[in-house]
Design a protein with these regions (language model features):
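Catalytic-core regions built around general acid/base machinery
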Residues: 33-44
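Short secondary-structure boundary/capping elements
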Residues: 29-33, 83
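Surface-exposed cleft-lining segments at the edges of enzyme active sites
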Residues: 19-27
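Asp-based, Mg2+/Mn2+-dependent phosphohydrolase catalytic module
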Residues: 39, 50-154
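Transmembrane alpha-helices of multi-pass, membrane-embedded glycan-processing enzymes
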Residues: 26-29, 107
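A metal-dependent, Asp-based hydrolase signature
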Residues: 1-19
Length: 154
């Protein structure tokens, strides 16, 4: 998906550059509030990731984030990229939960809009205090960080 994104943006790149970038993405650590908030949420909810990343990249990243998820899902399972409705539908099927029972949490408006269009609820993590925008679908919740999300959902 990194290669696809760079090509769509018209950014010239080599295979080595893509490999380096993916290796850096795999090593990303969560924000400091995330691990404790996820543990709190884990007590009441199933936790899953739906990512535009490739399955191999997501598996490699698992070692670096240290958070136990019930499911780590690549959009490759749906054959499309977010925000295509098929990605959200496939994730719901994998998790085994109805679309309207899912709260999709994201820090990108397009993820929230896609989830809402697919029939999910959405929470927007607004760390940068920026307006959500005048999208046709708005999130059900807007919170500053995962700590606030966990507090509101507990």
């Amino acid at each position: 998906s990194v290669d696809y994104t760079l090509e769509r943006a018209g950014i010239a790149h080599t295979a080595e550059e893509v490999n380096w970038l993916v290796a850096q993405i795999e090593k990303l650590k969560p924000f400091p509030d995330v691990p404790a908030a996820m543990e709190k949420l884990r007590k009441r909810y199933k936790l899953a990731i739906l990512s535009n990343g490739d399955p191999d990249m997501l598996e490699a990243a698992r070692a670096h984030h240290g958070i136990a998820f019930d499911h780590i899902i690549s959009v490759a399972a749906a054959g499309a990229f977010k925000p295509h409705v098929a990605t959200y539908t496939k994730a719901a099927q994998i998790v085994g939960v109805a679309m309207n029972e899912i709260l999709f949490v994201a820090n990108h408006a397009f993820d929230c809009v896609g989830a809402k269009a697919a029939g999910m609820k959405a929470a927007f993590i607004d760390r940068r205090k920026r307006p959500f925008g005048k999208w046709p679908y708005q999130p059900d919740m807007i919170v500053a960080d995962f700590a606030e999300l966990a507090e509101q959902l507990s």
